[in-house]
């Protein structure tokens, strides 16, 4: 073949180096330090507000600046949390019937779930959703988390800030200073949140999974308590979440920063003794969150396909008899 053989091998080598898998890896490496900033600072910071007592009470403006209201056709549907200027974390079951991103908006920076029509500040903190990414790694398990990619970049201020996220090596158990927030109903009988529909907060304790499995064994649901979820609340039922809180964050204070540990997922009733709420374990899905943000953070042309086309077109000439 003369010199044509080495040329062909060189082109084929270029194709292999440019294959889609390696493109994703190089994309991940490039974007980790630019578009994603999942662990970048500052995060998990909030206004200095006086601590409140435990037990399902109204919150204060700016106390949980990462809190998001996911709105379906202009009405609050689920909670969520701001991870970065373009990404919101929430529960997958919120989109069981409504996966069209055009039907959703995300409200940030508001204490109420029903801001006044004349509240211009509320509209400046409302963002359209570009993509809804639901975790579907294993259909046999819940994997109850989803990412929303916003159509435009969020403007940070004192009332809008991202929450921190811990990597997969983090353990959520034995965290004493944890809170969950939401606009859900107040009781199991669906007693609605009264005007002015302010965000509520409650301090919760995280149970170890073996204890949680014991509590849910009576309903034959103990097999659902695996490493991708955890239980939190109060065993006497005094601290819990309910309908409308789904997708909202459970956060813990560590060294002065707030980290999201869980996502409100499911439970049996609301506030029942010995039946704590079930939360998606965020750190368990850290790698999935990071990967989805990287792969959807920026779209680059895949050079492997046109390069492969050139190689194949030139192959007959390169291999022709000399």
From Swiss-Prot:
Location in or out of the cell: Cell membrane
Leader sequence residues: 1-19
GO molecular function, one term: serine-type endopeptidase activity
Chain ranges of the Peptidase S1 domain: 53-294
Active site location: 93, 144, 246
Keyword Secreted annotated: no
SMART domains per UniProt: Tryp_SPc (SM00020)
UniProt modification remark: N-glycosylated.
Disulfide linkage: 78-94, 178-252, 212-231, 242-270
Chief place where the protein resides: membrane
InterPro entries, alphabetized: Peptidase_S1_PA, Peptidase_S1_PA_chymotrypsin, Peptidase_S1A, Trypsin_dom, TRYPSIN_HIS, TRYPSIN_SER
Classification via CDD domains: Tryp_SPc
Protein name per its UniProtKB record: Serine protease 41
Gene from which this protein is expressed: Prss41
């Amino acid at each position: 073949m003369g010199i044509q053989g080495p040329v062909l091998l060189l082109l084929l080598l270029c194709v292999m180096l440019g294959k889609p898998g390696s493109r994703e890896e190089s994309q991940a490496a490039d974007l980790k330090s630019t578009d994603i900033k999942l662990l970048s600072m500052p995060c998990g910071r909030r206004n200095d507000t006086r601590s409140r007592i435990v037990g399902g009470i109204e919150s204060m403006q700016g106390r949980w600046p990462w809190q998001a209201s996911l709105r379906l056709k202009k009405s609050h549907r689920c909670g969520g949390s701001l991870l970065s200027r373009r990404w919101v974390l929430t529960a997958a079951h919120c989109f069981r019937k409504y996966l069209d991103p055009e039907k959703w908006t995300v409200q940030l920076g508001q204490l109420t779930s029903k801001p006044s029509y004349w509240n211009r500040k509320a509209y400046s903190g409302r963002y359209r959703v570009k993509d809804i990414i639901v975790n579907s790694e294993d259909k046999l398990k819940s994997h109850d988390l989803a990412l929303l990619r916003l159509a435009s970049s969020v403007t940070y201020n004192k009332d809008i800030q991202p929450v921190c996220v811990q990597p997969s090596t983090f353990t959520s158990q034995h965290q004493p200073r944890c809170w969950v927030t939401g606009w859900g109903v107040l009781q199991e009988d669906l007693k609605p949140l009264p005007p002015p529909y302010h965000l509520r907060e409650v301090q919760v304790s995280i149970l170890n999974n073996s204890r949680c499995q014991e509590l849910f064994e009576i309903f034959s649901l103990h097999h659902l308590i695996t490493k991708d979820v955890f239980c939190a609340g109060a065993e006497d039922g005094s601290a819990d979440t309910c309908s409308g809180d789904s997708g909202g964050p459970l956060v813990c204070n560590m060294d002065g920063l707030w980290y999201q540990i869980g996502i409100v997922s499911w439970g049996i009733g609301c506030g029942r003794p010995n039946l704590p709420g079930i939360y998606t374990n965020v750190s368990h899905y850290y790698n999935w969150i990071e990967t989805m943000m990287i792969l959807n953070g920026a779209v680059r042309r895949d050079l492997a396909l046109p390069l492969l086309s050139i190689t194949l077109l030139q192959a007959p000439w390169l291999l022709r008899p000399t």
